[in-house]
Each structure stands twice: as C-alpha cells, then as structure tokens.
C-alpha cells in the first residue's frame, strides 16, 4: 500500500515538473513570436512609398501616383486617390 501511494505521488510530481517545463517553453516561444512580429512591423513602417495608390489618403505632402488624382469624395472626410482615366506608361 505504501509503495502504491509513493508511486502515485512520484508520478504526480513528474507530471507537474514536465507540465511546468512545457509551459515555460510555450511562453518563451510566444515571446519570441511577438518580438518577431514587432520587428516586421517596424521594418514595414520605415519603408516609404513614393506615391499613394488607389483609395489611399492624399494631401500635398502625400501625392497620388501618376495615373491617380487627389479628390474629395463624400461621405469620406478626407481626400483620396481616384483613377484619372489614364493608364501608366510601361
């Protein structure tokens, strides 16, 4: 009887240690993934476009691409780039 109880307690202790190790590993992977996502976001924010594309918000300092024109469209409260009915030259 003492051996059976000792075996059950020992098995529970082993499962607790394994579970704790698995949880720590999962948390480390989650933190690494989050860090990787933040690095990708930072890299994409530093990449500047030379012009704004279709339905992109435009102003004087953010011009539209050659085949778009900046127009105010109701009910949108800001200017957007719309097609000026021309095609870009290749």
UniProtKB/Swiss-Prot annotation:
* Coiled-coil region: none
* GO molecular-function terms, A-Z: ion channel inhibitor activity; toxin activity
Q: Which UniProt keywords apply?
A: Disulfide bond, Ion channel impairing toxin, Knottin, Secreted, Signal, Toxin
The organs and tissues expressing this protein are described as: Expressed by the venom gland.
Q: Where in the cell is it found?
A: Secreted
- InterPro entries in UniProt: Huwentoxin-1
One GO cellular-component annotation of the UniProt record comes to:
extracellular region
Keyword presence, DNA-binding: no
* Propeptide residue intervals: 20-50
> What functional role does this protein have?
Ion channel inhibitor.
Know the name of this protein? U7-theraphotoxin-Hhn1b
The source organism is Cyriopagopus hainanus (Chinese bird spider)
Lineage at the top is: Eukaryota, Metazoa, Ecdysozoa, Arthropoda, Chelicerata
